[in-house]
Amino acid sequence: MAVVETVDNRPRAEGAVLRAVEQFVVHMPEISRVELRRAFHSATNFWAGDARELWWRWTTETLDSVGVRAQAVDCTVAEAIELAREGAILLCAPDHDESGVHPVVIDGRSQRSISIRKEGQRRNVRLKQVRSLLKSGGGTGMIRCVVIDPDQKHLVKSMGPAKVKPLQRVWQLLRPESSDIWLVVVFAFVVGLLTLATPIAVESLVNTVAFGRFLQPVIVLAILLMSFLTFSAAVIGLQTYVVEIIERRLFARVAADLSYRLPRTSQNKLKGHDVPETVNRFLDIALTQKVTTSLLLDGVGLLLSTFIGMVVLAFYHPFLLGFDVVLLASITFIVFVLGRGGVKSAIDESKKKYAAAAWFEELARCPVAFHTSAGRELAADRANTIIAAYLSARREHFSVLMRQIIFALFLQAASSTLLLGLGGWLVISGELTLGQLVAAELIVAVIVGGFAKLGKHLASFYDLLASVDKLGVLFDLETEKPSGLISPPGHMHSLQLEDVVIGGRSRSIILSPGETLAILEENQMSGEQLLHAIYGFDDLHEGHILIDGLSPDDFRPDTLRERVALVDDIEIFSGTIEENVDLNRFQISPAAVREITTELELADDILHLADGYDTKLNSTGHPLNRNQLQLLMLARALVGRPHILLINRALDSLPDDDLERALSCLLAPKRQLVTVVTTGRRDIAACLNSVWSLQDTPGSH
C-alpha cells in the first residue's frame, strides 16, 4: 500500500522539486523557465524513481542542461551552514515522508542573514533555525546538498568570443569579492586616519615645548601615539589576512571555472589553435594574485592616506587647499594624460612573452628536429627574432611608464619645496603656527613619498590589466551548448547517414546494431570530418546524420558521447592505467577494465609492470609503447559500452597480430555495435560489412 501511495504521489513530489529548482536559480533571470522545465522533464524521465532518492540527480542534470554549474555534495550540517555563510546557495531535502520530498533553498548571498525558500515562501532566518531545519531529517549525520556559486556568471560566461576591455575583466573577476574588498577599503581608511597620529602628535609636542617645559604632556602624547600606532598595526594585520583570503578565492574560482570550461569547449571553433599553448595563460593567475594583493594593501592605502592628508591640509589654510587642488590635477595628469597607451603597450609586451613561451614549447615538443645542427640554428634564430620583438614592445611600454615616473619624481621635489616656502611665509605672516607647519610637512612627506612609489604601482596596474587580458583568452573559449535531450525516445541504437557528401559523392546508409562501415581513403580528410560530425565535434555541411531518428545536435553533448565513442589520436593524461581507461566513470568497475584489456591481450603486458593497473603514465604514455597505447584507447572506448563506435585511422598503424586481436574484439557478436571506421588499409576495410571507397573515381561504386 505504501508503494502505491508513493507512485501516486510522484507527480506531486516532482512538482515540489521543480518549484525548488526554479527558486534555486531565481537570481539568474537569463535562464529560460521553459528550457528549465523541459530539462527537468527529461531528467525525471531518464532517472525515473523515488523523488526522495533522486531529487539531487534531477536537480544537477537539469541545471547542467541550462548551463548552470552545480555540485552535489555530502556534508555535515556545520559544513552546509559554513557554505551558506560564504555566500553559496544550497538546495537540500532535510525532511521527507511517504508523500514525497520537501526541498528547501538556503540562500547565503546576504552578509547579514541567511534566507530560506520553501514551498514558494521566502523568509530570513537565524543560523540556529537553519541548523534545526537541516537536522530535522537526519540528526547530526551527513546531508546531501546541491550547491551553486551565485557569482559564477561574473567570469564571462562564453558561448562565443566576447569583446571585453581589460578594465571590465578586472571588475568581473573581482566583483564576487566586492564585500571583502570594501572591508579592505574600510581598513585602509582607518589606517589612513591613524597615520595622522604622528603629525598631530608632533604638532602638539612642538606647541607644548614652545610654551613650556613640562614632562607630563610629553608622556601623555607618547602613550596616546603608542596606542594609535598599535591599533593601526592590528588593523593592517587584519587587512593583510582579508587580502590573503581574496587571493585564495581568486585562484580557486578561476581554476574551477577553467576545469568546467575546458572539457566543454567547442572543438569546431578550435581548429587551427594550439590549445595547450593557450592554456599556459592560466599561469597569469599568479601575477594577478600578486598584483591584486599589492594594490589592495599598498595602492588603496596610498590613495586614502593621500586623500585624508589633503583634507587635513585644506583645514589648515585656504592656500593649502589650493595646494591640494594643484596636487590632484598633477596626479590626474600623470595617470590619464601621460599614461596614454600604457595598457595597450603592456598587453602587447605580454603577448610577446607568450610568443617566446610558445616557441620554447615547440622546441621541447620536437626533440628530434631540433637536435640537429640546422635545427639548433633555427631554434636560436627564431628565439632571437622573438627576443627582439619583446625588447621592442618592452621599450615602448617602458617609455610610457618612465615619463610617468619622471613627472611623479619632479612633482615630489616641487611639492615639498613649494610647501616649505608657502608654509614658512604663512608662519611668518602669523596665519599658521609652527606646529601646523611641521605637521603639514610630515603629511606632505607621506603624500609625496607615495609619488615615489607611484611608478611601482602604475607598473603593477598595467601588469594586472595585461594578465587579466590573457586570462580573458581562456574565458572567451567558446563552449558547447549545454541543452539537449538526455535520452532519446527510441532504443534501436541505429545510425542513419542520409545524402552525406563524402569523396565527391552523395551517399546514404542505415546501420543497425552489429553492422559496420569502412570509409577507405588515402589522403583525404572527409571521413574524419564525418566521424567528428557524428560525435558532435564538427558540423556537416551537406546531408543528414540521424541517431535513433535524431540529429546529434538534439542531444546534450555529454549524453551523446555516452552513446557514441570516438577513437582518434592517442590521448593520455598523467594518471594510472586504470584511470586512463575508466575516466572515473562510476558505472565502470575495475573488473570491467581488466576484462576489456584481457580481450585485447593487453592485460599481461600491464601486469608485468611493477604497479600493474596502478602504474602511472605520463602525458607521453611512458612506460607503454605506441601500439599498446593505441589498444588502450580502444579499451577506453569499448569499456563504456557505447552503442556507436567511431574509429578514425586508429587501426592503421597496428601490426598484424595486434590488428587481428583488435578486430576480433570489435566484431565479437556479443557487442552488437554500430561501427564506423576510417582507414587507408584495404585489409581492414575487407573485414567490415560495408565499404565506402574514396580511392575510386567519382561516379564509381
Placement of each model-derived feature along the sequence:
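Cytosolic ends of transmembrane helices, especially the final helix of ABC transmembrane type-1 domains
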Residues: 352, 375, 447-477
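Primarily ABC-family ATPase nucleotide-binding module
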Residues: 475-518, 668-673
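An intracellular "coupling" helix at the cytosolic face of ABC transporter transmembrane type-1 domains
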Residues: 267-268, 280-292, 296, 300, ...
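Membrane-integrated ABC transporters
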Residues: 1-197, 215, 239, 243, ...
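Hydrophobic alpha-helical segments in the permease module
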Residues: 224-236, 327-332, 404-415, 434-456
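ABC ATPase nucleotide-binding domain helical subdomain, centered on the C-loop/LSGGQ "ABC signature"
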Residues: 578-619, 664
